[in-house]
Curated annotation (Swiss-Prot):
Keyword RNA-binding tagged: yes
Keywords, in A-Z order: Actin-binding, Cytoplasm, Myogenesis, Nucleus, Ribosome biogenesis, RNA-binding, rRNA processing
Region spans: Disordered: 1-36
Protein's name in the database: Protein FRG1
Name of the gene encoding the protein in the UniProt record: frg1
Source organism of this protein record: Takifugu rubripes (Japanese pufferfish)
Coiled-coil zones: none
Compositionally biased region (Basic residues): 18-31
Organism ancestry: Eukaryota, Metazoa, Chordata, Craniata, Vertebrata
Length: 255
């Protein structure tokens, strides 16, 4: 366990990565953005885009409509492709257990945890979570791969097994993690409601949130808001707001 905890969060090392051509036309950019934002959902199973979304039951899609399939022998293979509107079969569904802010464990329908053996073969025969049963989903540039405890990415071998043998992530190591968990509708920027709008409206929002209304009057700092605009650009917006509120001596969280 100690050896594995030393492994740092990983970025994808892509094989033969090429930079895409830039589209100067605004309409083309807008079209590409719209396509990127279109949810990838198959039979109620949607693609996970970040670690935060790793919840509940998941399926690992390694090719179009083909998922990692658990065998009763404790081994895994790539299942037969499904129809475009068809989700994964029960042997292709796994339970997610979050172990940290970056690592998970996966439990098959046979009640065993996915891990790797000394040869890098993915197996599901353990009834407990040890160092070999820990996985790190790696997200980068809209792509995703799954890192095993041996610091290798999983892929599908010529012999029909699921293995973790590659230190770099190429097309064969790319996969999609799909989940059937209920989706949370969030705004694209994921900003708090108090942080929306211009700097003055944001300041009013925070004053309403934190001010002690002893005489039921809203006290807002009348100083120049240009300092707030600069602070927002510099990433010190909340510090600046707190400083302005503290000068008004009306915030129960300030001096």
């Amino acid at each position: 366990m100690a050896e594995y905890t030393k492994v740092k969060s990983t970025k994808l090392v892509l094989k033969g990565q090429k930079q895409g051509k830039k589209h100067k036309h605004k309409d083309r950019k807008r079209k590409a953005t719209d396509e990127d934002e279109k949810p990838d959902i198959v039979g109620g199973w949607w693609v996970v885009k970040s670690f935060v979304e790793m919840n509940g039951t998941v399926a690992l899609e390694m090719q179009n409509n083909a998922y990692i399939h658990a065998l009763d022998s404790g081994l895994f293979t790539l299942g037969a492709p499904h129809k475009d509107d068809e989700g994964p079969d029960p042997p292709e569904q796994f339970t997610t257990i979050k172990l940290s802010d970056s690592r998970i464990a996966l439990k098959s329908g046979y009640g065993r945890y996915l891990g790797i053996n000394s040869e890098g073969l993915v197996v599901g025969r353990s009834d407990a979570i040890g160092p070999r049963e820990q996985w790190e989903p790696v997200f980068q540039d809209g792509k995703m791969a799954l890192l095993a405890a041996n610091s290798c990415f999983i892929s599908y071998s010529d012999s029909g097994d699921i293995v973790a043998n590659s230190k770099t992530a190429g097309d064969e190591e790319m996969l999609k993690i799909r989940t059937s968990a209920e989706r949370e509708t969030r705004s694209k920027d994921d900003l708090a409601e108090e942080d929306r709008g211009n700097v003055k409206s944001c300041e009013v929002n925070y004053v309403k949130k934190f001010q002690s209304f002893q005489d039921r009057r809203l006290r807002v700092n009348e100083g120049d808001s240009m300092t707030l605009k600069k602070a927002r650009t510099d990433g010190k917006f909340h510090e600046a707001l707190l400083d302005r509120r503290s000068k008004m001596k009306a915030d129960r969280y300030c001096k």
